[in-house]
């Protein structure tokens, strides 16, 4: 029986300054209390078995690209992830590259985007604002919204490296 694990690796900044400003203005029309928007890519890596330290370092090197992400203590966090049951073109190419670099234990590499909002003072998003902002942050044809509360994320240690284990939990309709 295979030992398949899905790793969650934080990555680079997802949006340019221009795109961040444009998106922030759209979000501020929904909720004027939002003062800052940061974004970063998250890589989800399906692995069959454990990676050696060398394999893990190679994987990190391959997935190290772009500007360093800005990490702050955000008030609200949203995720846009590929639709369940689909394989994005980015995932196909990234998985090919990883395999060509000799990482045969890696079954698939996928990329999502984490958006972090900072609100003024003690402001909190209302449910209708949260829903409207989630709609702005993802393209429903190829991505679906998520948030930290909609995903189970736990810290773990694997071969001396701190990684996040990511499991998608589906919310059931009543």
Predicted regions and their residues:
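Core nucleic-acid recognition elements
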Residues: 1-174
């Amino acid at each position: 029986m295979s030992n398949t694990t899905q790793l969650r690796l934080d990555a680079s900044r997802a949006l340019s300054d221009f795109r961040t400003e444009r998106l922030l203005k759209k979000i501020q029309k929904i909720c004027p209390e939002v003062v800052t928007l940061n974004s970063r890519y998250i890589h989800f890596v399906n692995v069959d078995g454990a990676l050696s330290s060398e394999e893990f370092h190679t994987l990190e090197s391959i997935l190290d690209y772009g500007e360093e992400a800005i990490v702050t203590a955000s008030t609200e966090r949203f995720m846009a992830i590929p639709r369940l049951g689909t394989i994005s073109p980015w995932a196909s190419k990234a998985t090919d590259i990883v395999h060509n670099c000799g990482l045969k234990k890696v079954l698939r590499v996928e990329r999502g985007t984490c958006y972090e909002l900072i609100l003024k003072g003690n402001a909190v998003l209302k449910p209708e604002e949260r829903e409207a902002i989630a709609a702005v942050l993802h393209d429903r044809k190829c991505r679906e919204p998520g948030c930290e509360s909609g995903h189970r994320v736990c810290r773990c240690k694997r071969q001396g490296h701190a990684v996040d284990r990511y499991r998608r939990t589906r919310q059931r309709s009543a």
